[in-house]
């Protein structure tokens, strides 16, 4: 049972000929659960194939609760969310020393609401790295709210279409040109927005972990080693 609107169909090419395949994009939760229940009763193995990392915008909790109620056991497998696939494509580090040590994963409110305390403005006020999902159709509003929250209009941003797919397209822009960039390249959905100075990674501090003067559990820093010799 795969999320047909998001899962790359190439992932289904390795299935056995007798495998029953269901596209959950055309199904309700109840229909998905009935397929699972029936298959379990028949002793079959079921794969519920989500996109990216299921724990992020995957609507998996309601499925797990229902399976628990039915007494059907299951295992969860971790995946790679779009924000991490995009970081790999763009060679980004979200947590650059003295630039940002936090990554905020969020979305604009659409037909699925967002708690008021989790507004784009409140998150933008932190000036941390942000990965914004499910908001491609609201980029003008997103830009306004990011700027209202504290980001300057020229803050670096990236628009990543279909991260990790063969069709992936990456565009570096700014907070104020997100909508313009999407329109120019015909991007209307299935894109991730990344915001923050880490996108351009122009100025940051060297990490302490590999600094020769820094002592860790595994090695003594040069400064401390010199001090010990003097003692």
Range-by-range predicted roles:
Residues 53-126, 166-172:
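Class I SAM-dependent methyltransferase SAM-binding "motif I" and its flanking Rossmann-like core
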Residues 1-77, 179:
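Class I S-adenosyl-L-methionine
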């Amino acid at each position: 049972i795969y999320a047909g609107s998001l899962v790359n169909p190439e992932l289904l090419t390795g299935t056995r000929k007798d495998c029953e395949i269901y596209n959950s994009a055309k199904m309700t939760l109840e229909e998905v659960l009935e397929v699972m229940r029936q298959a379990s009763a028949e002793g079959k193995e079921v794969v519920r194939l989500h996109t990216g990392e299921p724990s992020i915008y995957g609507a998996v909790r309601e499925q797990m609760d229902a399976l628990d109620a039915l007494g059907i056991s299951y295992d969860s497998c971790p995946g790679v969310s779009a924000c991490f696939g995009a970081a790999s494509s763009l060679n980004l580090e979200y947590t650059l020393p003295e630039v940002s040590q936090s990554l905020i994963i969020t979305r604009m409110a659409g037909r699925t609401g967002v708690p008021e305390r989790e507004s784009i403005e409140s998150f933008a006020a932190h000036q941390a790295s942000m990965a914004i999902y499910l908001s491609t159709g609201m980029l003008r509003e997103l830009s306004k709210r990011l700027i209202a929250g504290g980001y300057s209009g020229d803050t670096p941003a990236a628009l990543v279409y279909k991260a990790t797919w063969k069709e992936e397209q990456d565009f570096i822009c700014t907070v104020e040109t997100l909508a313009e960039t999407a329109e120019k390249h015909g991007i209307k959905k299935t894109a991730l927005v990344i915001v923050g100075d880490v996108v351009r990674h122009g100025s940051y501090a060297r990490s302490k972990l590999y600094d020769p003067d820094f002592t860790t559990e595994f090695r003594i820093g040069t400064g401390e080693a010199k001090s010990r010799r003097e003692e």
